[in-house]
């Protein structure tokens, strides 16, 4: 844990805790010592999620005790069984299920008051102000010291490095023309950065504990998915002014965290998954989108009934199980998702608006990191697994698993490119976390194992725009970006960086490359 951040959290605790807690009874002191640095001194979240009863609906108290004792796979949550007694662990579990004295909220007025506009030092140019291909830039998120680096993807040289908000989510999003990149932080901040002029433009706090953001394919809107408050927030992509707050609740008023939101460009809509409701939402933003009806109508294609008024109407799709993670097929007609701990994935057709198929997926598939490619004349989807040492390869016509590829250990990411015969994965959640595995996309066999920094975590590969080079991250404070020739698999260059959690190529993201996440 960061000693300075823990000290600041402890200093802030008396002012932030309810009056009854200022005497620091044992459980509050335990929380301050072991939990506040990640989950916030008032349990509102930080690098870790908010720990409040409304955010723990799906977690039984007995399971919470187990998580505190043993940790949680695929997260930074480490177990405390060796540091705390069973009584202390049970006390902490009871504490996080206790409502706070004052219910947390974040209103649209507070959002507007938080907005920051950074004036340019000189007039902005409408063309890149550097000698590099703007479509082959990488945005590298360095979580080690909360910075981002803009990297030239041809020379592999940094063009700029700047401080970011604390605890960025690993997936920044780009405007359709590639000029702007938008960052979302776990504590609710959304930041807009101009890649042409290499400067921060504006920022706004759109929530207290945020999951991720999405940018509409027409470049007009940013949608923010929040764990706290339970909401989606639509922002103007030009100004970052808030346009609408959509409460995440079902028809009976039961609220939910928002697991994730993504842009479905061919549909002109955002798709959001709800953490605590068996629903996904389609939220059209295109003026030509079909009307949205709440309740039953005879035939929505005949425009019968009274449509929900915009902007951002919500079309509710009930599904068979929760979707904690999901992936679009190539046509954006189907969503493939799974609940954490479920033994099967599900396919939801967005046109017929229901679950249509289930898929046998053991362990904990990380479908949000899935990719697709053509295999024997058909398209397959491949997903890593956070719990099992396998890559599941799925036929997207039959929704059957055609092969499970055994890897050195459970992994987090899978990446490829249209111009390479290989897919790359990691073994992040295993003793072999220093190993990258290279898989032939046609034979579905492992062709190489690479250890760019023995003993150190290697993960998250991203390709250059042309697919010639693969960039891997060494996830350590004394980490690096390691550049490989994607054909020979030989190292080309190494750039020292502070825990580079991910790097994102402009071209691959805005063209929705089949080899990267969207």
Question: Residues of each region from the PLM?
Answer:
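Extracytoplasmic electron-transfer domains, predominantly the class I c-type cytochrome c fold
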Residues: 37, 42-47, 51-101
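Surface-exposed loop and turn segments in beta-propeller and other repeat-based domains
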Residues: 245-254, 287-320, 359-365, 450-454, ...
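Flexible coil segments in periplasmic/lumen-exposed cytochrome c-class electron-transfer proteins
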Residues: 22-25, 32-34, 78-144
């Amino acid at each position: 844990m960061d000693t300075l951040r823990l000290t600041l959290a402890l200093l802030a605790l008396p002012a932030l805790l309810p009056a009854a807690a200022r005497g620091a009874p044992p459980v509050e002191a335990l929380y301050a010592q072991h939990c506040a640095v990640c989950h916030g001194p008032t349990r509102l979240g930080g690098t870790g999620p908010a720990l409040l009863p409304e955010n723990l609906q799906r977690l039984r108290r007995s399971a919470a005790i187990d998580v505190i004792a043993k940790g949680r796979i695929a997260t930074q949550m480490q177990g405390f069984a060796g540091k705390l007694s069973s009584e202390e662990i049970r006390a902490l579990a009871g504490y996080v299920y206790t409502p706070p004295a004052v219910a947390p909220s974040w209103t649209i007025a507070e959002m507007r008051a938080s907005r920051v506009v950074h004036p340019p030092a000189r007039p902005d140019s409408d063309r890149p102000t550097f000698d590099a291909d703007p479509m082959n830039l990488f945005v590298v998120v360095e979580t080690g010291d909360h910075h981002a680096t803009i990297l030239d993807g041809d020379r592999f040289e940094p063009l700029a490095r700047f401080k970011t908000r604390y605890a960025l989510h690993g997936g920044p999003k780009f405007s359709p023309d590639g000029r702007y990149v938008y960052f979302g932080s776990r504590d609710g901040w959304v930041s807009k950065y101009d890649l042409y002029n290499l400067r921060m433009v504006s920022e706004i706090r759109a929530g207290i504990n945020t999951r991720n953001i999405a940018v509409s394919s027409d470049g007009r809107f940013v949608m923010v998915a929040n764990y706290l408050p339970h909401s989606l927030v639509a922002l103007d992509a030009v100004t970052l002014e808030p346009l609408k707050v959509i409460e995440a609740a079902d028809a009976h008023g039961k609220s939910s965290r928002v697991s994730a939101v993504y842009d479905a460009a061919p549909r002109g809509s955002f798709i959001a998954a709800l953490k605590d409701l068996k629903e996904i939402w389609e939220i059209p933003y295109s003026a030509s989108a079909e009307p949205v009806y709440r309740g039953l109508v005879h035939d929505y294609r005949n425009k019968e009934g009274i449509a929900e008024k915009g902007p951002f109407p919500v079309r509710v799709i009930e599904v068979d199980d929760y979707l904690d993670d999901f992936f679009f097929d190539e046509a954006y007609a189907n969503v493939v998702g799974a609940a954490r701990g479920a033994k099967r994935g599900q396919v939801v057709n967005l046109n017929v608006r229901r679950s249509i198929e289930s898929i046998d997926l053991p362990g904990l598939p990380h479908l949000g990191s899935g990719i697709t490619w053509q295999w024997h004349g058909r398209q397959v989807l491949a997903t890593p697994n956070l719990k099992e040492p396998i890559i599941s390869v799925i036929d997207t016509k039959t929704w059957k698993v055609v092969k499970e590829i055994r890897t050195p250990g459970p992994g987090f990411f899978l990446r490829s490119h249209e111009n390479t015969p290989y897919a790359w994965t990691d073994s992040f959640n295993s003793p072999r976390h220093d190993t990258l595995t290279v898989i032939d996309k046609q034979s579905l066999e492992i062709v190489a194992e690479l250890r760019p920094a023995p003993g150190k975590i290697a993960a998250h590969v991203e390709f250059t725009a042309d697919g010639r080079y693969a960039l891997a991250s060494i996830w350590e404070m004394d980490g690096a970006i390691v550049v490989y020739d994607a054909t020979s698999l030989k190292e080309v260059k190494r750039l020292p960086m502070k825990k580079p959690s991910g790097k994102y190529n402009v071209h691959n993201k805005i063209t929705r490359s089949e080899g990267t996440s969207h």
